Amino acid sequence: FDMGGTSTDVGLVRDGEIERTTEAEIGGHPIHVPMVAVETIGAGGGSIARVDEGGAVRVGPQSAGAEPGPACYGRGGTDPTVTDASLLLGYLGTDTTLGEDLDLEVGPAKAAFERLLPDTDLDDPVAAARGVYRVATERMARAVRKVTVREGHDPRGFALVAFGGAGPMHATALAERLDIRSVRVPRANGVLSALGLLAAPLRNDASRTIREPLDGIDPEAVEERYERLLEQVRGEMGSPGGVTTTRQADLRYAGQSHELTVEIGAPFSPARAAERFHAAHERARGYRLPEESIEVVTIRVDTTGSADGPDISHEGERSEPTGYREAFFGGEFRETPVYRRDRLPSGTDIDGPAILEGGESTVVVGPDWSGTVDERGTLEVSR
């Protein structure tokens, strides 16, 4: 769950593997290339709240951006945003410094929500902020359901990994909305995507479309095609150490418009490919059709090299709160401890409600959540 300033991206990791797809849509255009399966919505910390003609509160996709940014930045922004709502609810503080030199101002944030009130039946900017926060959380919940429930997975069986500059501020509230009982917030979560880019192993894919019925395919001809693909990716990858290669195929039942990518092993066996596809289809869609014929749409070779990730070991020296402030939980404002996350040593226990502030993000831990900081600085909380 990656929430930034203008958008939120959600993906699924199942059995240690990130879900991938060969079908996506960008700007209304279908894209058919291998990619990580990500559901994106236009809701982030800078997303602007408004009231539509029917009186319903909407959040995004319009964004205040970085300039002028949310009203609380004090840079001339006048529209109410999700970040402004978080400030009025106490999740961010006026003593919170974002980046190196940006101090938040509650006055402009309050004024922005006051301008929203005439279009609602509310008379309190804090009540409007609560509504905006709830609407934003529900939009994110719908995105999570699209990558879980819609694909036949129960989100209650997963942990929510929250990152991005704004993600950890909504993580436990989002988890409660989905009845998820475990949340993990990695260290350096505000720049985790950039860190992942640097640490990710080199990967190269090659594919060939064949579109043939599985029960009539020539296994030897398929093997020859796989060998040519292997030669191609090996030439492009060079000779890095620790290279692993897998053979895959995009398969579907006859008449379907979507495929599933299945690892089929070597040498190519139609019977093994069929059984793995039936099992994959049942996991992904909830059913199998053993009497239906299967089509081989594309064969693929996936080559991954090793990568030396950065050292992200963690040391801290202070486990006590640095202060307290009033924050909104359970229908009321409550005195809430505030911690400096980068100073928390591994093994520190955290009981909600609590707020953990760091250089690039803020973590909000709701009531009934508790957990600890592990040796890498990851915060793991559950309820």
Question: Where in this protein do the model-derived segments appear?
Answer:
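Short glycine-aspartate micro-motif
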Residues: 1-2, 38-40, 184
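Gly/Thr-rich phosphate-binding beta-strand-loop-beta motif of the actin/hexokinase/Hsp70
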Residues: 1-14, 47-50, 172
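C-terminal, non-catalytic interaction/recognition modules in large multi-subunit enzymes and RNPs
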Residues: 5, 44, 53-54, 59, ...
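Conserved beta-strand and immediately adjacent loop positions that scaffold enzyme active sites
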Residues: 9, 37, 361
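Early-domain small/polar-rich strand-loop-helix modules and first-structured segments
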Residues: 14-88
